[in-house]
Each structure stands twice: as C-alpha cells, then as structure tokens.
C-alpha cells in the first residue's frame, strides 16, 4: 500500500471514531428509549466500521 492509501484509511478510521463519539453523546441526551437505542446502534456500527478498517490495515501492512 502507498502512504497516501494508508493515510486515507487512517482518516476514515478517525472519521468513524468521531461519528461514534457523536452518536454516544446523542444517546446520552436522548429523551426516550427508542431514540437512545437508535443512537447506541449507530455508535456501535460506526465503531465496528473503524475496527474493521483497522484490522484491514494491519493485515495489509
């Protein structure tokens, strides 16, 4: 992989982590259980996407 490709993947990982943190904050502010659950699900999905990209990056390096 080129340095540019690695940098791009790392940027995506950071973006997914940021989105996960934003969803966690939204879940804390949610006023009903359904909204809270949806934000927690989105948080987990974003965190999983970041984990998957990290694993891919480590396997390709």
What function would you assign to each model-found segment?
Residues 8-61:
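Short, charge-rich amphipathic interface segments used for partner binding and complex assembly
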Residues 4:
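Conserved catalytic/binding loops enriched for acidic/polar residues
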